Amino acid sequence: MTNLFQDDSLTLHTDLYQLNMMKAYFDDGLHERRSVFEVFFRDMPFDSGFVVFAGLERIIHYMQNLRFTETDIAYLHDELGFDGPFLEYLRNFKFKGNILAAKEGEFVFKTEPVLQVEASLAEAQLIETALLNIVNFQTLIATKAARIRSVIDDETFAEFGTRRAQEMDAAIWGTRAAYIGGCDSTSNVRAGKIFGIPVSGTMAHAMVQAYRDELEAFRSYAKTHFDSIFLVDTYDTLKSGVPNAIKVAKEMGDKINFIGIRLDSGDMAFLSKKARQMLDEAGFTEAKIFASSDLDEHTILSLKAQKAKIDSWGVGTKLITAYDQPALGAVYKMAAIADENDILQDSIKLSSNTEKVSTPGKKKVYRIITNEDGLKAEGDYIALADESLENVDKLTMFHPVHTYIMKTVENFTARELLVPIFQNGELVYDMPSLDEIKAYKEENLALLWDEYKRTVRPEQYPVDLSVKCWKNKMRNIEKVRKSVQLHSPVELDMPF
């Protein structure tokens, strides 16, 4: 059988058109021209009021191993027809650029850069696909997990989605993202080993079915597991499962730690109330009721509204697949490119869809934090790279489209969201531990007003442009429109 994975190179984890463009740049002598690209998304996933940035650790691993292997070169030559000096360039390829990004666990919002690449045109083009692949998936899962965490308060929350994930890599990295977003543990043993995430799990229906009866299965499980949670819905939750769990717990006494029971089907609100009553009457008032089965933040909110007696939640399919919105839609757009004198010139992408018009120029993003009612974020402020908010005492923030919507902020702190990750191709960022990332996410959560954290119809968090950045965008739009009109061979009557 052919070895499908001859090496562990991810460098060809890119779209063909990236290589096609690199070849054209190389042939025209443009491949070393300095450029700036930025990653952002246009819409808030799940109609959420916030998004949790994730994926940076995998980006770092990817960038540190970015090189074309001999098997890569052979494939590009034999199968795709690349040859000559271009292949030699790829053989000696090394990323020498700069990458800035939001920290993992940072709350980010639509239209603002969450990652910025400044590198040669060829370098920046090659890494687009992988960067978007990583950010789009992990940020989506971290956000979904954070939304689930927001509705269950301090109750425990386990990630149970491995078998429903879109393949093994998605399960592993999705688990990590879910942990950043708010889950307490995972059923995925490999993810526990790799990342140090606490692992949790009970039993499956198959174990109950494998024994003569449910009672025997529970007894067997209790003999081998001091911490016992019994799955009670294989046959009949209230007539069989819960009574048998209680019976085994009483039989075993101090020989086990009877943690509780798990419900995996049926009317969770009704069954949890009845099961709680039965456990309490049997003297197991401390026993917990765990729930699983196609849960998400909406189902959990509904169960809580029905006063379900559930203490812990196992969330699988709808978390690990981001079931209700399986794509974030982050894009990677050129913001600037150097001229013949290596001076960066603005670059803009226009569209008849106004939300798809990019904001030109190399930029920075500030989070504006005031001391009103404790530290609170007033909004994010996108400025051009040469702007600074040092020694600025009063800041006017206005909506970038509806410019009459504005406010003035005083006594604020401005924190830059994008921090250096790679400089001149070298890693300069100290990657925090996963628990530190998770704690950072919780710190950031406290900065948001409750109105932005609502699960349903949250208030829209302000993301504004500086006056200079806004004027620069308008100037570039007009410049491109005039250029198109001047050089277009076709005359069109535009509706605006």
Language-model region placement:
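Gly/Ser/Thr/Ala-enriched C-terminal appendages of enzymes
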Residues: 2-33, 37, 47-48, 295-496
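Buried, small/hydrophobic-residue-enriched core segments of structured protein domains
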Residues: 2-35, 43-45, 81, 87-96, ...
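N-terminal, Lys/Arg-enriched amphipathic/low-complexity engagement segments
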Residues: 35-91
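Short amphipathic alpha-helical segments
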Residues: 55-58, 140, 433-437
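Short coil/turn segments at secondary-structure boundaries
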Residues: 74-75, 143-147, 161, 453-460
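Short acidic, Pro/Gly- and aromatic-enriched capping/linker segments at domain boundaries
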Residues: 99-105, 412-417
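Hydrophobic residues within beta-strands of alpha/beta enzymes
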Residues: 200, 261, 289, 311-313
